[in-house]
Regions:
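Phosphate-group recognition and catalysis centered on beta-loop-alpha active-site segments
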Residues: 1-201
Length: 201
């Protein structure tokens, strides 16, 4: 069994902020597995970054996908000296020393991240699994790499007020799991009363 460092062993007030190479090195050195988030730049390079937008972590405007990788190098993570890392560089650094949980950040129906990142992961020699809030990403893996352990992320979207509509009702209640057939579900632990979460337990 492994304990995992969420976005690396990080502290956003230090020189090892979330999803940084420094935070990942600290996790490896401490013997923790690593959970990280990947998405594509404008020039289709997988980078490790949680939010779709730059504002919270980098103080910048726009989204990751609005910038090329080189353009993103102008930004620093949480006022540290760390910059947004390439997924490929993280894989090379970890080098199978600890297991990875790779969250695929997929907006709407754009699945272009999946084949690009999957090519890198198939060449990777370490232990890993994938997960995503977007069931289309989980389904892509069911179809194209069914032997890989895949997870469906979910949350009480409607309770948090920021999200409304049929789509978030479907996601909150895991209504597409019968199609995507995830190997595990990771649900926001702050909402134990949600029926779909209870059923999964």
């Amino acid at each position: 069994e492994w304990l995992y460092a969420h976005r690396g062993l990080h502290d956003n007030a230090t020189q090892a902020p979330e999803n940084s190479m420094a935070a990942f090195r600290k996790a490896v050195d401490a013997g923790f597995g690593i959970e990280l988030d990947i998405q594509l730049t404008k020039d289709k390079i997988p980078v490790v970054f949680h939010d779709f937008t730059l504002k919270r972590v980098c103080g910048g405007e726009g989204k990751i996908c609005d910038y090329t990788y080189e353009e993103l190098q102008q930004f620093h993570l949480c006022e540290s000296t760390e910059k947004i890392p390439k997924f490929e560089d993280v894989l090379q650094m970890v080098d199978g020393k600890v297991p990875l949980i790779v969250e695929f950040k997929i907006e709407r129906t754009d699945l272009s991240l999946c084949p690009i990142a999957d090519k890198m992961l198939r060449a990777y020699k370490g232990m890993y699994c994938m997960e995503s809030f977007n069931p289309l990403g989980v389904q892509w893996y069911r179809k194209n790499h069914p032997e890989l352990v895949r997870g469906q992320l979910s949350d009480a979207f409607l309770k948090e007020g920021e999200y409304v509509g049929v789509l978030y009702f479907v996601l909150q209640n895991l209504l597409l799991n019968f199609v995507t057939k995830p190997d595990f579900v990771a649900y926001n632990h702050h909402y134990p009363e949600i029926l779909s979460r209870k059923l999964c337990r």
